[in-house]
Structure formats: C-alpha cells, structure tokens
UniProtKB/Swiss-Prot annotation:
Biased composition (Low complexity): 175-191, 250-285
Keyword terms: Acetylation, Coiled coil, Cytoplasm, Endosome, Lysosome, Metal-binding, Phosphoprotein, Transferase, Ubl conjugation pathway, Zinc, Zinc-finger
Organism: Bos taurus
Protein EC: 2.3.2.27
Listed GO biological process terms: negative regulation of HRI-mediated signaling; protein K63-linked ubiquitination; synaptic signaling
Cross-referenced InterPro entries: Di19_Zn-bd, KCMF1/Dystrophin, Znf_C2H2_type, Znf_ZZ, Znf_ZZ_sf
Stretches of the chain forming a coiled coil according to its record: 224-257
Modified residues (Phosphoserine): 2, 169, 189, 212, 335-336
Protein name: E3 ubiquitin-protein ligase KCMF1
Biochemical pathway: Protein modification; protein ubiquitination
Gene3D superfamilies: 3.30.60.90
Similarity section: Belongs to the KCMF1 family.
Length: 381
C-alpha cells in the first residue's frame, strides 16, 4: 500500500497521507506527516524534542530496501522513547533500555507495539523495560513453528519486504488496528519463496487468531474473577446486614420486654403502695375512733358539772313525763265535758234553766254586740 490508511496528520489534518509517517512516543495518539515533521510542527503538548518513530508504507519500504538481501531475522529500526536514539533492533533496544533507563518511570508509547501487526499503536507504559522483557522477548514462543515465527518477526504495519512474491495477490493480506485510534492497513508477504508458502501463511493467520482469542480470554479471566469476588462481597454484606437486623430486632424485643416488666412492676408497686396507704389510713381512722371512744369514756368533767348534767337530765325526763300525762288527761277531760253537755241538754229539755259557763256567756254577749253594730239604722219616722 502506498498510503497510511486510517491515519491523519495532527498538524495539517491530512488523512491517508503518503510518504513517511512519524509517530510521537510521548504524546498519546499523535502522528505527523513528513512535511509537518520537517517543518517542526509543535502544539501545547508536543515539542520537537519528543522522540518520534518513523513508519514507512510498503511501497516506500520496497523502494528503499528492495535491492538488499534481508535475512529472516533482519530487524526493523526502532527509536528509544527516552533518549530519542534511533536504529535499535528489538534485542538492542531491550539491552539499551535495561542498561541506560532501568530506573526511569516516565510514561511512553512502545514503538514495537506501534509497528507490529495487531498491536496497540498507542500502548502507554510506565515500565518500558519490563514491557520489553515480557512482551517483546528476542526468542519467540518455542511452541511455534519456524515459519510462523519468521512471519511474526517480518510482518510490519505499513511495510512489506521486497521480492517479486510481495506483489502476488494470493500471498498478502491486510490488517487494521482496533479501538478507533490511528492505524494503518498494509499487505504482507514473505521474503523467501522456500521458507514461506500459502500453508505457512494460513498457519500464521490461525496462530494469530488463537493468540488474540487467548489474550481476550486472559483479559476476561480477571474480570470474571473480579465479578465472583464482587458477588462474594455482596453476599457477605447481605449476611452482615441480616445479622445486624436480627441483633436490632432482638434488642428491640428485649427493650420491649423490659419496659413491660418495668410497667408491671411499677403497677404492682403502685397498687402495693395504695394498699398500704389504705391500710394505714384505715388503721389511723380506727385508732382515731378508738381515741374518740377513749376520750368519751375518760372522766374529765368535775363533780359540779356532773351534778348539773344529771339535774338537767332529770328535769327533761320529768318534763317529758308531764307532757305525756297532760295529753292523756286532756283526752279524758274532753270526753267528760261532752258527757256533761249532754246532761245539760237533757236538763234543758226537761224545762230546767241552762246554766252557761262564764266564758260562753261572754262570747255570746260579744256576738250580740257585734250583730247590733252591723244592723242598719231604723227608718225615720
């Protein structure tokens, strides 16, 4: 391919540009075309002192290195992201970083990941030496075949190795980076006709797919374990919450029981106090009544007072007796008066003179005088 497909210059904003591509190893996702890099384009975050990794298209690589005979293990040229020195291979870059920048902890972008197919073009790491030893060791996986290993080492984004086989349509394939970041698509072809054949390419593709699937499984493994840990934590929290609720309920029940017992005890105490008060009051009243009786029974009056009281009582008794006798005598006298009047009437009938008592005669005289006063005067003569 003659273009950096999917990549745009961050200075002139030209997309899918031709020529050399310069990727900053300090700034995240920052690419420049050749003209902007040579003119010294800078921004607020990017300066000309930042190390840049040069990436070529396949056409430019064939143009620059087409006449040279490269072995299978011929490395690419990488730039140190710390000091900016160029021309390192994978092994020499690892040796340089471990010897010169072992204690440096600045966050940089791995130039090898940006150049390898399927790698992260913006992989940021703060321990570049450990990243190189873990991810970009010189002896590749031993379980892979030599052809597959050669394909992995010779594949490079934006580059292709020379030879007439590189231009055959059935011997190259395209790859693109993921994540929406700056990427490049290019065709790949082997350098030796004997070493590489279509079966080896298919095997290399299958191994790449297996590696990507294994990486995804490895990346998803801790997430599943984290989910399990979270579930266990949630279950423990729920158990703790239930235990706390049970403790609260037991405490509430205990407080309610104590309150009811205290209420009953207070009621019994109040009833006992009222009963005791009532008994005390009744005892006091009994004692008071006893005291009154004793006071009445006690002889406190003098002899003269007693004699006067006895005389008064005797007089009263005599008066009552006289009243009773007088009433009885009046009834007998009234009956005797009626008998005498009957006898006087009998005497009158016999022609005897009626003898009036004096009070009756006086009453008759008074009646006659009053009648005379009430009579009208006689008519004049």
């Amino acid at each position: 391919m003659s273009r950096h497909e999917g990549v745009s210059c961050d200075a002139c904003l030209k997309g899918n540009f031709r020529g050399r591509r310069y990727k900053c190893l300090i700034c995240y996702d920052y690419d420049l075309c050749a003209s902007c890099y040579e003119s010294g384009a800078t921004t607020t975050r990017h300066t000309t002192d930042h190390p840049m990794q040069c990436i070529l298209t396949r056409v430019d690589f064939d143009l620059y290195y087409g006449g040279e005979a490269f072995s299978v293990e011929q490395p690419q040229s990488f730039t140190c992201p710390y000091c900016g020195k160029m021309g390192y291979t994978e092994t020499s870059l690892q040796e340089h970083v471990t010897s010169e920048h072992a204690e440096t902890s600045t966050e940089v972008i791995c130039p090898i990941c940006a150049a390898l197919p399927g790698g992260d073009p913006n992989h940021v790491t703060d321990d570049f030496a450990a990243h190189l030893t873990l991810e970009h060791r010189a002896p590749r996986d031993l379980d892979e075949s030599s052809g597959v290993r050669h394909v992995r080492r010779m594949f490079h984004p934006g580059r292709g190795l020379g030879g007439p086989r590189a231009r055959r349509s059935n011997m190259h394939f395209t790859s693109s980076s993921t994540g929406g970041l700056s990427s490049s698509q290019s065709s790949y072809s082997p350098s030796n006709r004997e070493a590489m054949d279509p079966i080896a390419e298919l095997l290399s593709q299958l191994s790449g797919v297996r590696r990507s699937a294994g990486g995804q499984l490895n990346s998803s493994g801790p997430s599943a374990s984290q989910l399990q840990q979270l579930q266990m934590q949630l279950q423990l929290e729920r158990q703790h919450a239930q235990a706390a609720r049970q403790q609260l309920e037991t405490a509430r029940n205990a407080t309610r029981r104590t309150n009811t017992s205290s209420v009953t005890t207070t009621i019994t105490q109040s009833t006992a106090t009222t009963n005791t008060a009532n008994t005390e009051s009744s005892q006091q009243t009994i004692q008071n009544s006893q005291f009154l009786l004793t006071r009445l029974n006690d002889p406190k009056m003098s002899e003269t007072e007693r004699q006067s009281m006895e005389s008064e009582r005797a007089d009263r008794s005599l008066f009552v007796q006289e009243l009773l006798l007088s009433t009885l005598v009046r009834e007998e006298s009234s009956s005797s008066d009626e008998d005498e009047r009957g006898e006087m009437a009998d005497f009158g009938a016999m022609g005897c003179v009626d003898i009036m008592p004096l009070d009756v005669a006086l009453e008759n005289l008074n009646l006659k005088e009053s009648n005379k006063g009430n009579e009208p005067p006689p008519p004049p003569l």
